[in-house]
Amino acid sequence: LQGFNDEVLDLDHETFARECAIDVPGPETDALGALARQWDAFVMGQAKARHPEFPGRFFNVGFVLSPEGEVILRHHKVVPLLPVEHSVTPHNVWDRWIELYGRNLDAFYPVADTEIGRLGFLMANEGSYPENARGLAMNGAEVVYRGPYPHPHVGNGLFEVQNRARALDNNFYLIACNVGTYYLHTDSDVPIDTFGGGSAVIDYRGQIVGRHDYSAGSSWVAGTIDIEALRKFRASAQWDNWIKDLTTEQYQLIYEQPIYPKNLYLDRAPYTHAEYRREVIDRQIELMHERDVWRRPDKG
């Protein structure tokens, strides 16, 4: 709802949390809830929002509004747009988060069970990591909101590849909703577009059933979502309903060693862009080289 000024302009986290972040529920979701009631529809969206247990901080929160206008799901983004997004994630405050919500799928990949299907969130950069989509699927998701993704990875096709792969791998519908143009400052005269369209509805076999490539402004996309067809496919396919065949004991070996540091912002505000590169990115790349996961490039 607030755009991306905090990311683009490298704004101070605590100032943004105090002056720009919202509460969910709050006046903004109340206004959207009125539209949900008017049109007897579910509304899915996201906003930079505060959390009562983490004063001075904000998260990127996905929310579902019911046709009655009530907030029935809140999802706290688990991977920000690294390295520029300042939103805190559950992993950034891991110890306190699991103390509050437990160490289970609902704490990180919540799903709303509704009359139109089980709804979940795969917001923006979350979709860059297959594990996040799988977490939703393992918690029962059937229709997944994929939030906005910027250039260059819309124009070069990466956004579509990710979206179709996540839907195919997990046999769920994916609604990829990119953003239109926006104004970077309150006094801006000309809107900018750093995203580039690519909104789509993708079915549980990875096929596009509706797509809107580009409009240089606000627009819409539509497609049929057949939940019963999805459920029948999952229940009757012999091969490509993949999740039934997961050899989980084997896959656990991949993740035995920690990689990204947990509790990064448990006791401090998120880094600025320059700090993040120095304190996190450079160290993470070195870690991959030290473990011989990646081979170092030749010098010169």
Model-predicted segments: where are they?
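Short, conserved active-site loops that position catalytic residues or coordinate cofactors/metal ions
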Residues: L1-C20, R146
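Short beta->alpha transition motifs characteristic of CBS
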Residues: Q2-G3, F63, R74-L81, A200, ...
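Short helix-coil transition/hinge motifs at the ends and kinks of transmembrane helices
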Residues: L11, S87-T89, T186-D189
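Glycine-rich loops and low-complexity Gly/Arg-rich segments
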Residues: E19-A21, E68-V71, V88-P90, I98-Y101, ...
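CN hydrolase (nitrilase-like) catalytic-core segments centered on the catalytic cysteine
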Residues: C20-M44, R118, A124-A222
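Active-site catalytic loop in hydrolytic enzyme cores
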Residues: A21-I22, D30, A34, H51-E142, ...
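Recurrent small/Gly-Pro-centered beta-turn motifs in extracellular repeat architectures
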Residues: A47-K48
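C-terminal beta-strand edge segments of enzyme domains
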Residues: N178-G300
